[in-house]
């Protein structure tokens, strides 16, 4: 029988960290959960009061899970410091299981002076509806204090390496595809928690002025429908938004465009090959040449998926970008310019609007008409 790792340890070996915190979304034979924690009093730049590691087996009794071990220790320690407010941070190899997630939510509800931030390397059973609901319950904010859950990126892995690993002063060396796996998990967690976009982010990036400066990011909102009895049925669990990854962010040396990040995550949806699906994207910029080529390849290789793209603006509509849009349309994608109807739909669906209605900006319809004419000319190979 394997030990239950009752006592916390201060550090782990390098191979142990690299093996157990490897962030490939689908991973087998990682049955030990490692939970690195830091506890500090609330306040800016306060040093941690305690920082150690709990371990536990995935399939052991609940009380042996590292999350429960932490709260068993913390509850006893908390009795001596009842009036103090604390910030707790976890860096954990697997996100908590369903039962642990519910127990964590209960603990936080009963002790509002404790806030918890959870950085996870991988998501546990992210496809299970009951687990998704448990995560949403844990992370909801409006009914009281809850946890904040995020996916570990390069900075968190580097921090754990320095704080919890026998690093021998060696620098953390990220494994192949760490940034790509981070983005996949980040998108999937956003779907589960139903993240919403800030209103200023939407209005700034989706403004459809004909000539804009300083809009270097591409935002992509998406939703998926399945054909059922000749009717398109919206799949609520398959909608969200993402943006491109800038160079040197999250470990990407060269950056990655939003459309490619989106294509990366679709295989994890496990769409039924015998069903028909319609994917609709609302993008702040139309795809560049390379992204258009990749999207064309995708729909050519996945005949059960149709693609509709509504763009707020046309990206660099000269030369190869025009060619890319024509290639994408020829492959079967429907490409259109966003109008008031699509802007309002995105506002209602993807933005944390707090009940405020969509307010169109000056010139929205005029800009949409002008851009629609330009797009028609491009797709008809007439130039400007």
Swiss-Prot record:
What PROSITE patterns would the database entry show? CYT_DCMP_DEAMINASES_1, CYT_DCMP_DEAMINASES_2
Entry keyword set: Antiviral defense, Cytoplasm, Hydrolase, Immunity, Innate immunity, Metal-binding, Nucleus, Phosphoprotein, Repeat, Zinc
What CDD domains does the record point to? cytidine_deaminase
User: What do we know about how this protein assembles, alone or with others?
Assistant: Homodimer. Homooligomer. Can bind RNA to form ribonucleoprotein complexes of high-molecular-mass (HMM) or low-molecular-mass (LMM). HMM is inactive and heterogeneous in protein composition because of binding nonselectively to cellular RNAs, which in turn are associated with variety of cellular proteins. The LMM form which is enzymatically active has few or no RNAs associated. Its ability to form homooligomer is distinct from its ability to assemble into HMM. Interacts with APOBEC3B, APOBEC3F, MOV10, AGO2, EIF4E, EIF4ENIF1, DCP2 and DDX6 in an RNA-dependent manner.
- Other remarks on record? Accumulation of APOBEC3G induced non-lethal hypermutation could contribute to the genetic variation of primate lentiviral populations.
Q: Please give the record's comment on domains.
A: The CMP/dCMP deaminase domain 1 mediates RNA binding, RNA-dependent oligomerization and virion incorporation whereas the CMP/dCMP deaminase domain 2 confers deoxycytidine deaminase activity and substrate sequence specificity.
**Residues that, per the record, bind Zn(2+) 1:** 65, 97, 100
| Name of the protein this chain belongs to | DNA dC->dU-editing enzyme APOBEC-3G
Question: In its keyword annotation, does this UniProt entry include Cell division?
Answer: no
């Amino acid at each position: 029988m394997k030990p239950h790792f009752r006592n916390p340890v201060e550090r782990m070996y390098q191979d142990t960290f690299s093996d157990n915190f490897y962030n490939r979304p689908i991973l087998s034979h990682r049955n030990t959960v490692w939970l690195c924690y830091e506890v500090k009093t609330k306040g800016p730049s306060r040093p941690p009061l305690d920082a150690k590691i709990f371990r536990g087996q995935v399939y052991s009794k609940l009380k042996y899970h590292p999350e429960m071990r932490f709260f068993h220790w913390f509850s006893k320690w908390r009795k001596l410091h009842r009036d103090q407010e604390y910030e707790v941070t976890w860096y954990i190899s697997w996100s908590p299981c369903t039962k642990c997630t519910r127990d964590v939510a209960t603990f936080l509800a009963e002790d509002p002076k404790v806030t918890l931030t959870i950085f996870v390397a991988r998501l546990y059973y992210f496809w299970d509806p009951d687990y998704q609901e448990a995560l949403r319950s844990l992370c909801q904010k409006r009914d009281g204090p809850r946890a904040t859950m995020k996916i570990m990126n390069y900075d968190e892995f580097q921090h754990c390496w320095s704080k919890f690993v026998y690093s021998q002063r060696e620098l953390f060396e990220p494994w192949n595809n760490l940034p790509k796996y981070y983005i996949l998990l980040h998108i999937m967690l956003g779907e589960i928690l139903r993240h919403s976009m800030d209103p200023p982010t939407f209005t700034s990036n989706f403004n459809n002025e004909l000539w804009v400066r300083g809009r270097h990011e591409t935002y992509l909102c998406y939703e998926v429908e399945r054909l059922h009895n000749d009717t398109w049925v919206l799949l609520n669990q398959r909608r969200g938004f993402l943006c491109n990854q800038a160079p040197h962010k999250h470990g990407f040396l060269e950056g990655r465009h939003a459309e490619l990040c989106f294509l990366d995550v679709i295989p994890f949806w496990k769409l039924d090959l015998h069903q028909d699906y319609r994917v609709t994207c609302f993008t702040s910029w139309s795809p560049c040449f390379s992204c258009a080529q990749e999207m064309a390849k995708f729909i050519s290789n996945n005949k059960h998926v149709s693609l509709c793209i509504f763009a707020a603006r046309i990206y660099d509509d000269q030369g190869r970008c025009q060619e890319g849009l024509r290639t994408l349309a020829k492959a079967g994608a429907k490409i259109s310019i966003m109008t008031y109807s699509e802007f309002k739909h995105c506002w209602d669906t993807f933005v944390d609007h707090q009940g405020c209605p969509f307010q169109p900006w000056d010139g929205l319809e005029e800009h949409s008409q002008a851009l629609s004419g330009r797009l028609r000319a491009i797709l008809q190979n007439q130039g400007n």
